[in-house]
Amino acid sequence: MLQGMLQRTCLAVVSTAQTLIVRDKHAFNRAVLKPKVRCHFPKPMEVKRINVHGWNARMSTPEGRRVLMNRILKGRHNLSH
């Protein structure tokens, strides 16, 4: 009985650790965070939206990186367009 409890506890700890490792791998992977592209992309205004508010635009300036960090700290799932 004690051995069974220990095995279940160890399995629970291992599965929790595996879940945490998987989540850490995907924390900033854009393909996992935002997997779908809009169906009729690129419409002209969507191109402008991506160019102005997109990931590359945010990462290219210090203020944009500050915006992304604030969104990360706030717990947003979608960091940028």
UniProtKB/Swiss-Prot annotation:
GO terms for biological process: mitochondrial translation. One of its GO terms (cellular component) is mitochondrial large ribosomal subunit. The keyword Ribosomal protein applies. It is found in: Mitochondrion. It comes from the Eukaryota. It holds the Pfam family Ribosomal_L34. PANTHER family: LARGE RIBOSOMAL SUBUNIT PROTEIN BL34M (PTHR14503:SF4), MITOCHONDRIAL RIBOSOMAL PROTEIN 34 FAMILY MEMBER (PTHR14503). Belongs to the bacterial ribosomal protein bL34 family. This is Large ribosomal subunit protein bL34m. The lineage of its organism: Eukaryota, Metazoa, Ecdysozoa, Arthropoda, Hexapoda.
